Amino acid sequence: MFRYDQVAHLTDQAYIDDLCDRVEQGLDQGLLPSHVFRDERVFKVEMDRIFTRAWVFVAHETEIPKSGDFVLRKVGLDQVIVTRSAGGAINVLLNHCRHRGTEVCHEDSGNTTHFKCPYHGWIYKNDGDFVGAPAMREAYGGRLDSKKNGLLRAPQVESYHGFIFTCLSESGPSLSEYLGDVSWMLDAIVKLHPAGLKVLGAPERFIIRTDWKIGAENFAGDVYHIATAHLSVNETKYISQDMRDTLKTGGGYRFQNGHGFITHRSSEMVGAEGGLWAYGLNPEIRKQFDLEGFDDAQKKMLLEAPPVAGNIFPNFSYLRGALPANAGDLPVVFTNFRLWQPVEPGVMEVWNWQFSYDALPDEYNREAYAAGQLAFSAAGLFDQDDSAVWEGVAKLGGSPWGRKEEVMLHYGQQRVEPDSTYEGKGDYFPSTFGEFNQENFWREWVKQLRSDVRNEVPA
């Protein structure tokens, strides 16, 4: 019998293999083909291979705290419903009716026991089980097997510190295996307070006409751009730090599977009381945090070179900083997580969540939300800068002249060696210069694109 997934690879396979070869060879020389940021064939294979096999963040448990709660999300190009069913189980369901395929859910969030298809009225429980259809006995004469007609369920769904991830491949690694040592970094971010993090409202969403990988690799490892792209922030009244100082204090943490985080050695910027407290946490807030549950390497990292931004491959990023909610106020720490959601070649949608620690006062959290939106949002000081320059990269990626000339982008700063005295997980590089985390991202990207879809097609 004809199977599209058994033959679809034939047209593009040689092209993708050749591109992967050129990317790998280019990285050895510090170069990257520019058209990887806007190529229809590349985009299609990314959706088919990376986003159906990687663990992708879809929601936080505090978004669906009660039985019946749901949110509508994306895994690559697939729209999914993330639900909490009776008993507290979390489900990730493909948002398409098993009858004729239309969407069964059209709300971004809500609470319900069932989903009803608006086309022919097929009904499903909020865990995806098929319940019935109008005149089912007359229409189908008992031939409709309810056990085989539920909404498609993601085969793997796991939560880590409240962050819900899904993997659409039954044969993929567990979430723990996929995260690997980067879980050590996530622990340090989330477990500063035993109550953990919570979302501060629904995610903001906005379009940037650029490739999803640009945001991901930037947050994973690009300290170098801050002194130039964000220099305009110096002219505002919201921040006292000179953006050019980041050239002296940057660094990065590299982890397996393409994950990476960046830091500013804030203890060098503001002295021994830097690190975690340099973010602007006031004494009353500091009292609520506890470092005793961390190992010695985590404590040292948090107090001397804490994570400022990072990316969990492929497209889930983190950022923490401090700005005043209003000009002239004291700075307030904000914690931001976001998805670089692919839409089409050269276009992504940013899904932007503000977080805070669950036990902190509501007044503080309101200020943290305002500070986070001021810095990173559709109208944020930093996102406006990034959007403007990132769009130019995607334009070059689609340039007929640039493609004809095989324009290569430069990823060849000095080769920096990891700090041999570092005792934490992963590798630590105490330097702004050196694109170790971007290279790490791209080598994982090549690895995923080389994973031939034929390997998972049943005989």
Swiss-Prot record:
What metabolic or biological pathway is this protein involved in?
Answer: Xenobiotic degradation
CC cofactor note = Binds 1 [2Fe-2S] cluster per subunit.
**Residues that hold [2Fe-2S] cluster according to the record:** C97, H99, C117, H120
Q: Which Pfam families match?
A: Rieske
Q: Could you tell me the EC number(s) of this protein? A: 1.14.15.38
- List the protein's name: N,N-dimethyl phenylurea N-demethylase subunit alpha
Record entry for activity regulation: Activity is stimulated in vitro by coexpression of a [3Fe-4S]-type ferredoxin.
One GO molecular function term of this record is: oxidoreductase activity
Subunit structure, briefly? PdmA (subunit alpha) and PdmB (subunit beta) form the oxygenase component of a bacterial Rieske non-heme iron oxygenase (RO) system.
In the UniProt record, does the keyword Nucleotide-binding occur?
no
Q: What happens when the gene is disrupted?
A: Disruption mutant cannot degrade isoproturon and other N,N-dimethyl-substituted phenylurea herbicides.
Binding, Fe cation: H225, H230, D386
Cofactor(s) the protein needs: [2Fe-2S] cluster; Fe cation
What residue stretches are annotated with the Rieske domain? 55-166
Give yes or no: UniProt keyword tRNA processing.
no
So which domain of life are we looking at?
Bacteria
Catalytic activity, as annotated: a 1,1-dimethyl-3-phenylurea + 2 reduced [2Fe-2S]-[ferredoxin] + O2 + 2 H(+) = a 1-methyl-3-phenylurea + formaldehyde + 2 oxidized [2Fe-2S]-[ferredoxin] + H2O; isoproturon + 2 reduced [2Fe-2S]-[ferredoxin] + O2 + 2 H(+) = 1-methyl-3-[4-(propan-2-yl)phenyl]urea + formaldehyde + 2 oxidized [2Fe-2S]-[ferredoxin] + H2O; chlorotoluron + 2 reduced [2Fe-2S]-[ferredoxin] + O2 + 2 H(+) = 3-(3-chloro-4-methylphenyl)-1-methylurea + formaldehyde + 2 oxidized [2Fe-2S]-[ferredoxin] + H2O; metoxuron + 2 reduced [2Fe-2S]-[ferredoxin] + O2 + 2 H(+) = 3-(3-chloro-4-methoxylphenyl)-1-methylurea + formaldehyde + 2 oxidized [2Fe-2S]-[ferredoxin] + H2O
User: Which family, according to the similarity comment?
Assistant: Belongs to the bacterial ring-hydroxylating dioxygenase alpha subunit family.
